[in-house]
């Protein structure tokens, strides 16, 4: 009995003897009626997960949403825009610093979970981009130049 339990535990852990279950078969005579042949379809197992195919070359340009939240409750709308694939520019300058930090923390987590990026353009102004959009430094310089954000000056 202890041998059976030990064999089951070793089998569960993958440590069982490979040769224990091999059986040797004797040659069998061919079927008397050789005109009948067995038809079968091979079963192909694939370990690859079938992923969602997304076109890299899309003809539509990404939409940009500019948000100047007045309360923390607007964070849900910001995250919804990001989920919809929009680039979101958030101006949190007029918020209380603690509320602004909470908003940035929440949006940062949402951006991370969507594989996007969050970058600070200026103090209190952030750009959130979805995973399929890359913001280069030239664009950040243009956005932070004088006159681009009229609400900041």
Curated annotation (Swiss-Prot):
The keyword Zinc-finger does not apply. InterPro entries: Cell_div_SepF, Cell_div_SepF/SepF-rel, SepF-like_sf. GO terms for cellular component: cytoplasm. The keyword Cell cycle applies. One of its GO terms (biological process) is division septum assembly. Its main location: cytoplasm. It holds the Pfam family SepF. Keywords: Cell cycle, Cell division, Cytoplasm, Septation. It is found in: Cytoplasm. Belongs to the SepF family. Cell division protein that is part of the divisome complex and is recruited early to the Z-ring. Probably stimulates Z-ring formation, perhaps through the cross-linking of FtsZ protofilaments. Its function overlaps with FtsA. Homodimer. Interacts with FtsZ. This is Cell division protein SepF. It comes from Clostridium tetani (strain Massachusetts / E88). The gene is sepF.
């Amino acid at each position: 009995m202890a041998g059976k339990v030990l064999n089951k535990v070793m089998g569960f852990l993958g440590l069982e003897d490979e040769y224990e279950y091999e059986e040797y078969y004797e040659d069998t005579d061919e079927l008397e009626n050789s005109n009948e042949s067995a038809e079968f379809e091979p079963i192909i197992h694939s370990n690859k997960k079938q992923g969602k195919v997304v076109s890299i070359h899309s003809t539509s340009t990404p939409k940009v949403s500019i948000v100047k939240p007045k309360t923390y409750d607007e964070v849900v709308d910001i995250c919804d825009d990001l989920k919809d694939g929009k680039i979101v520019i958030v101006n949190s300058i007029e918020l209380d610093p603690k509320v602004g930090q909470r908003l940035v923390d929440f949006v940062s987590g949402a951006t991370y979970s969507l594989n996007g990026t969050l970058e600070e353009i200026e103090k209190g102004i952030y750009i959130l981009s979805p995973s399929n959009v890359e913001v280069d430094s030239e664009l950040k310089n243009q956005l932070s130049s004088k006159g681009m954000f009229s609400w900041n000056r």
